[in-house]
Amino acid sequence: MGLTSQLIPTLVCLLALTSTFVHGHNFNITIKEIIKTLNILTARNDTCMELTVTNIFAAPKNTTDTETFCRATTVLQQLSTHSCSNKLLGGLHRNLKTMANMTCSVNEVKKSTLRDFLERLKAIVQRKYYRH
């Protein structure tokens, strides 16, 4: 009986450490996938890159990365019905949604091209990756 009561705290600690490792590992995989996808998309030279999208980066400077990812997810969701939507944009949307883990609205009036949107998003994601 004494051995069991000593093992329980040890097992709980090991479980907590394992979940932290898995979360950090998944985060690194997700952020690397996002960067890879953004690199592929921004290298394209097709008419879809000239689509007009909401400029979420015109928001206040004190916007957190999570809020930015949430807003980017919303913009990509709005593109999902467009003929330019493809598997890469869909995958980017899914990965950003896991990073944001919340829903939000986008009300900005300013617009930018999809290329500019993706380039600025790539810079933010890369910064987050190097800080992590």
Curated annotation (Swiss-Prot):
Signal peptide from the UniProt entry: 1-24
Glycosylation site positions: 28, 45, 62, 101
Annotated SMART domains: IL4_13
GO biological process terms on file: B cell activation; immune response; interleukin-4-mediated signaling pathway; negative regulation of inflammatory response; positive regulation of DNA-templated transcription; positive regulation of macroautophagy; regulation of immune response
Disulfide links within the chain: 48-84, 70-104
GO MF terms, alphabetically ordered: cytokine activity; growth factor activity; interleukin-4 receptor binding
GO cellular component term, pick one: extracellular space
Family matches, as Pfam families: IL4
Keyword Secreted on entry: yes
Keyword Mitochondrion attached: no
PROSITE patterns, alphabetized: INTERLEUKIN_4_13
Compartments where found: Secreted
Keywords: B-cell activation, Cytokine, Disulfide bond, Glycoprotein, Growth factor, Secreted, Signal
Matching InterPro entries: 4_helix_cytokine-like_core, IL-4, IL-4/IL-13, IL-4/IL-13_CS
Homology family: Belongs to the IL-4/IL-13 family.
Function: Participates in at least several B-cell activation processes as well as of other cell types. It is a costimulator of DNA-synthesis. It induces the expression of class II MHC molecules on resting B-cells. It enhances both secretion and cell surface expression of IgE and IgG1. It also regulates the expression of the low affinity Fc receptor for IgE (CD23) on both lymphocytes and monocytes. Positively regulates IL31RA expression in macrophages. Stimulates autophagy in dendritic cells by interfering with mTORC1 signaling and through the induction of RUFY4.
Name listed for the protein in its UniProt record: Interleukin-4
Record organism: Ailuropoda melanoleuca
Gene name as annotated: IL4
